[in-house]
């Protein structure tokens, strides 16, 4: 094999390793985001079950599992995840299937249009840019 061929082989191998690393990191980040979204969604229902009212602010989530985890309050206060405060949810999560409880607002993935949400039935899914824009309009 020529010197040029060896160099190209090494460059290709390094590129493959770099791509694999980035993909693995993105997968880890996605799983972390999904974990937080699900726990926040669960905390909305947990708060409702404790005092009979839907939470309307971060303080209303006190004593829920999510806020007992380290650094979670700060993440909410800094807007890493945005809770869509709603007072007209059904206590049965399945009835809230089309509603968004919380979404990822500050990850690198969300900045590139991969926005993850927790639906009212606690499903985690990506939403389209159009859905995200509509959600932001309703929040204002």
Question: Where is each model-derived feature located?
Answer:
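N-terminal Sec-pathway targeting helices
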Residues: 1-19
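Sequence-pattern detector for short linear motifs
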Residues: 7-9, 51, 117
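Conserved hydrophobic/amphipathic alpha-helical signal-anchor segments
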Residues: 15-83, 87-90, 123-140
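Small-molecule pocket liners
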Residues: 44, 98, 114-116
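Surface-exposed, charged secondary-structure patches
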Residues: 80-106
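Short, solvent-exposed coil/turn segments at beta-strand boundaries
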Residues: 95-99, 118-123
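Active-site and glycan-interaction determinants of carbohydrate-active enzymes
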Residues: 104-107, 111-119
């Amino acid at each position: 094999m020529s010197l040029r061929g060896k160099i190209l082989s090494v460059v290709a191998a390094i590129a493959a390793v770099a791509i694999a690393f980035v993909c693995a990191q993105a997968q880890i980040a996605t799983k972390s985001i999904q974990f937080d979204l699900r726990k926040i969604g669960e905390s909305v229902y947990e708060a409702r079950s404790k005092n009979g009212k839907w939470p309307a602010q971060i303080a209303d989530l006190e004593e829920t599992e999510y806020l007992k985890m380290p650094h979670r309050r700060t993440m909410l206060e800094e807007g890493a995840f945005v809770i869509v405060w709603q007072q007209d949810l059904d206590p049965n999560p399945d009835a809230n299937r089309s509603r968004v409880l919380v979404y990822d607002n500050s990850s690198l993935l969300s900045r590139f249009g991969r926005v993850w949400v927790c639906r009212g039935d606690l499903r985690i899914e990506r939403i389209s840019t159009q859905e995200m824009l509509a959600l932001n309009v309703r929040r204002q």
